[in-house]
Amino acid sequence: MRHRHGYRKLGRTSSHRAALLKNLSISLIEHGKIETTVEKAKELRSYVEKLITVAGKNDSNAHKAVFAALQSKEATKKLVNEIAPKYVERAGGYTRIIRTRIRRGDATTMAFIELV
């Protein structure tokens, strides 16, 4: 039974899931808006919003924590210096999910996830 299970497995092993979320979050930070499946977008939302909250502290420990999660110097720099300062006054809700279409190959619902 799946009762009260805390996250989506997305049909992947734990390491594959971690790599997927890391790569999706780097793409979202670099481009501001990406298209993915609704399930991945919902899981990515919680991952990215936690990173933005940590990056908003804007000290060296925040920088280290974000880099530990992303492993990308460019994305870390952009998140800490450009994106997070815009959301300092905001208490969560940094992303928006918009359902777009049904994918032709497997009829999966697709969605845009973007930074507000």
Curated annotation (Swiss-Prot):
SUPFAM superfamilies recorded: Prokaryotic ribosomal protein L17
Any GO CC annotation of this UniProt entry: cytosolic large ribosomal subunit
GO biological process, one term: translation
A GO molecular function held by the record: structural constituent of ribosome
Keywords carried by this UniProt record: Ribonucleoprotein, Ribosomal protein
InterPro entries tied to this protein: Ribosomal_bL17 (IPR000456), Ribosomal_bL17_sf (IPR036373)
Pfam families assigned: Ribosomal_L17
Ribosomal protein recorded as keyword: yes
Assembly and oligomerization: Part of the 50S ribosomal subunit. Contacts protein L32.
Family listed: Belongs to the bacterial ribosomal protein bL17 family.
Annotated HAMAP family: Ribosomal_bL17 (MF_01368)
Official protein name in the record: Large ribosomal subunit protein bL17
Annotated organism of origin: Sulfurimonas denitrificans (strain ATCC 33889 / DSM 1251) (Thiomicrospira denitrificans (strain ATCC 33889 / DSM 1251))
Gene field: rplQ
